Amino acid sequence: MSESWIVVGMAAVLGFFVGSINPATIIARTRHADLRQGSGNPGATNVGRVLGLRWGVVVGLLDVLKGFVPTFLALLLFDRLTAYVVGLATVLGHVLSPFLRGRGGKGVATSLGAILAVFPWFALGMLVVFGLLLWRTRWVAGSSLAAAGLLALYAGLAPLPDPVAAGRVWGICIALLVTIRHHGNIRAWAQRRLN
């Protein structure tokens, strides 16, 4: 194994560790709140339900930073491919946090942070689309899934910086991961439509 791949591997492990630190559960504990209430998800939306909007926004911003900082540092210190690996590892750490026995958050805000580091203009556009949909529908999960779909389209069709193939795979993987983490929301929506 070449030295460069060892560095990439170590950076990915560090990214996974940073991603696995869950601000939602830390803040909930300091506020003596139980995140098993609400949706039960250890993420910003549920913190907003349990502790109020202010704390939900704080957790959301911390999750965005958690995705942005490791990915941006990897881009700054190494290269775009390393940034993709670290960004994906950070999101995986968030959704599969060993500190939460593999039951982490849904990865939306952390993914946004990672995307902001490598595709900043697209990330801002995606955030606008998410915000408009949320304003119209008041449905966080649906707005998140629409943003994930937009990311998959962008990754698949847009002209990306080199390495192009890695960027396409990365974007589609992030979009799929967020979609899979929303399987319960998709199932609940489908049942409501059928009834």
Pin down the residues of each PLM region.
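N-terminal signal-anchor transmembrane alpha helix
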Residues: 2-30
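Nucleotide and nucleotide-moiety/phosphate-recognizing core
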Residues: 7, 11, 55-98, 130-131, ...
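Cytosolic, membrane-interface loops and tails of multi-pass inner-membrane proteins
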Residues: 24-56, 104, 187-195
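C-terminal ends of transmembrane helices
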Residues: 24-29, 92-103, 129-137, 182-189
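Short, non-helical or kinked segments that cap or interrupt transmembrane helices
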Residues: 34-43, 99-112, 139-150
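Interfacial segments of multi-pass membrane proteins
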Residues: 48-51, 74-78, 93, 108-137, ...
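Loop-to-transmembrane alpha-helix initiation sites
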Residues: 122-126, 140-148, 162-174
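C-terminal membrane-associated helical module and adjoining short loops/tails
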Residues: 164-195
